[in-house]
Amino acid sequence: VIIPQSSVTGKSNEERAIKKSILKKHTLEGVITLNKDTFYGVGTMPCIAVFTAGEPHPSNKECKFIDFREDGYKVSAHKGLLETEQAKDRKQHLLDVWFGRVNAESKFCVKTAIEAEDEWLHAFFYFNDELPTDVEFEKTIGDFLTFEFSMIMQGRGYLFESHKTEII
């Protein structure tokens, strides 16, 4: 089923109960996070939830969570969503990973058991353990210092008082 991502986050007790009810009757095979522009102009963040209907979800079932936001389609002004040269290869890679023909890095696919309380999205399960490049690190430090300076200039320096450390 193609649904908004908010349908699989399950933040409220009612949403968690719905997800629990679904798992009692159906097996979640996986969720594919789609490009935010898949339904260009609608303003929803879509995903595809794949179920095996009529079979209760086993507690130890490993589900696939795939980040397919980079699907090879781009928005063009006045034309909408257009296929790029990479679209076919990316779709084939998605299918190869889904059907277990190739392994994928965890930044593309995470396989794990789930519970109704979990967010059923790749971003919930993915942990980026890559070391940042020097450029990325310097940018992050620069962004933080800019933020801190801005807060101090707005009279909110107290937010940082307990976190000051002396650099020798």
What are these model-predicted stretches?
Residues 1-168:
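A conserved structural/catalytic subdomain of Rossmann-like adenosyl-cofactor enzymes
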